[in-house]
């Protein structure tokens, strides 16, 4: 049985024996300053070349979210301990032990955008009478359910993309003794999420909504992942560049990112607070779309440039431009093809989707000629200003702070 080379940090692994029965009461009633002294899990950077800004907690600006992060750390041992309570545990123990190892290796080290916002915003959306210690605890459980599903999709992506590393360590399926057995592990992670719902939420008034929201998340995000692979022939690796359009990029963002990261997080939080109204959330599509589009396009930017002004070593530069090498539809690819001349288009078509660094560098040179970095910065600023103008117009009962927090998570500044 594979043994994890990298175990959970002490802030989580030691909490099993220290978990306070009063933790839900403390989070429901305490001031945030009482909850932030113990550091949570620090998410690791995806590679040594990731900007230093990403190695810091994205919640340093927000005391409430620091508290939510800490609370998720506190209940982690109990939530993951439910694996040992599966009726078949003793009979097929090695499989379920590996499930726990897969979760420990992949789930706690992300940014926890979904989980932290569910825990923090639950208290913002719920009626004060509904903010009981039990429901605070359930918000943390639901936060972990969302994070398990997030890791599930990341692991599938790693397998399909043949990725070697994620967040600075080997991907789960690349570890010795794992390989394509990881497919079973990700399927078990999905099923374990619904097992957690069945154990913790049967008495929650919005249990059916929560179950359906997660099921719909899986369906829509799988469609997005499938759509991502329609732009390149899986056998010949030939790319259909005519499909590299702004319209298709928007569709890709909607199904692969926006539904799963923003739309679904708001749905789950609303259902957790027992105020779920799909019509209200549908009204917010333009704002959630703009935030999500910016989130994905920033990922595309970081794949090419990392942070503005960052100086990279030569060895680190080789990890840039992965999207070019793998033939991904990105903001930069569709933008370049929409404004380039015939010579530049030929260079892109001749070099895009090829693994050699020389090929990706040729594409990057075209991007430089077209000043795509400058155009991206303009697009980012326009998006921020649009959100700054539109968020105050929301008047359907959902607090503006929800969208300001989402926006800060993407732009690192608040639209106020």
Swiss-Prot record:
InterPro entries: FPS1-like (IPR039702), Isoprenoid_synthase_dom_sf (IPR008949), Polyprenyl_synt (IPR000092). Specifically expressed in the anterior midgut of male beetles, the site of aggregation pheromone biosynthesis. Induction: Specifically induced in the anterior midgut of males. Expression levels are regulated by juvenile hormone III (JH III). It is an enzyme of class 2 (transferase). Keywords: Isoprene biosynthesis, Magnesium, Metal-binding, Transferase. GO terms for molecular function: (2E,6E)-farnesyl diphosphate synthase activity; dimethylallyltranstransferase activity; geranylfarnesyl diphosphate synthase activity; metal ion binding. It catalyses: isopentenyl diphosphate + dimethylallyl diphosphate = (2E)-geranyl diphosphate + diphosphate. It comes from the Eukaryota. The keyword Lipid biosynthesis does not apply. A motif (DDXXD motif) lies at residues 157-161. Its EC number is 2.5.1.1. The keyword Transmembrane helix does not apply. One of its GO terms (biological process) is pheromone biosynthetic process. Mg(2+) 2 binds at residues 157, 161. Binds 2 Mg(2+) ions per subunit. Pathway: Pheromone biosynthesis. Mg(2+) 1 binds at residues 157, 161. Its cofactor is Mg(2+). GO terms for cellular component: cytoplasm. Belongs to the FPP/GGPP synthase family. Geranyl diphosphate synthase involved in pheromone biosynthesis. The Asp-Asp-Xaa-Xaa-Asp/Glu (DDXXD/E) motif is important for the catalytic activity, presumably through binding to Mg(2+). This is Geranyl diphosphate synthase.
């Amino acid at each position: 049985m594979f043994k994890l080379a990298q175990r959970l940090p002490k802030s989580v692994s030691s909490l099993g024996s220290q978990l306070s029965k009063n933790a839900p009461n403390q989070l429901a009633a305490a001031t945030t300053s009482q909850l932030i002294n113990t550091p949570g899990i620090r998410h690791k950077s995806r590679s040594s070349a990731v900007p230093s800004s990403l190695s810091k907690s994205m919640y340093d600006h927000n005391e409430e979210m620091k508290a939510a992060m800490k609370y998720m750390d506190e209940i982690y041992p109990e939530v993951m301990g439910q694996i040992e309570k599966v009726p078949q545990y003793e009979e097929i123990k090695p499989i379920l032990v590996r499930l726990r190892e897969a979760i420990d290796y992949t789930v706690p080290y992300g940014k926890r955008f979904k989980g932290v916002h569910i825990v923090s915003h639950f208290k913002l959306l719920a009626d004060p009478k509904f903010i009981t210690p039990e429901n605070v605890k359930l918000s943390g459980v639901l936060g972990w359910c969302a994070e398990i599903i997030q890791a599930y999709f990341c692991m599938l992506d790693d397998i399909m993309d043949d990725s070697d590393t994620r967040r600075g360590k080997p991907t789960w399926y690349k570890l010795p003794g794992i390989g394509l057995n990881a497919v079973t592990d990700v399927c078990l992670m999905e099923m374990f999420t619904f097992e957690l719902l069945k154990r913790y939420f049967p008495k929650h008034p919005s249990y059916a909504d929560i179950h359906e929201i997660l099921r719909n998340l899986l369906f829509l995000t799988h469609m997005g992942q499938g759509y991502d692979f329609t732009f390149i022939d899986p056998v010949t690796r030939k790319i259909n560049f005519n499909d590299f359009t702004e319209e298709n990029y928007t569709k890709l963002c909607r199904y692969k990112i926006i539904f799963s990261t923003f739309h679904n997080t708001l749905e789950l939080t609303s259902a957790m607070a027992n105020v779920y109204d799909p019509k209200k959330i549908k009204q917010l599509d333009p704002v959630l779309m703009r935030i999500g589009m910016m989130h994905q396009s920033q990922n595309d930017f970081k794949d090419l440039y990392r942070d503005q002004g960052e100086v990279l070593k030569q060895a680190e530069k080789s990890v840039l431009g992965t999207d070019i090498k793998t033939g991904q539809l990105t903001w930069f690819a569709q933008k370049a093809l929409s404004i380039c001349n015939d010579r530049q288009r030929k260079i892109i078509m001749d070099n895009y989707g090829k693994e050699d660094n020389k090929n990706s560098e040729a594409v990057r040179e075209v991007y430089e000629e077209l000043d795509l970095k400058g155009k991206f910065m303009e697009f980012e600023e326009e998006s921020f200003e649009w959100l700054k103008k539109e968020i105050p117009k929301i008047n359907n009962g959902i607090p503006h702070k929800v969208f300001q927090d989402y926006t800060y998570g993407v732009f690192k500044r608040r639209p106020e």
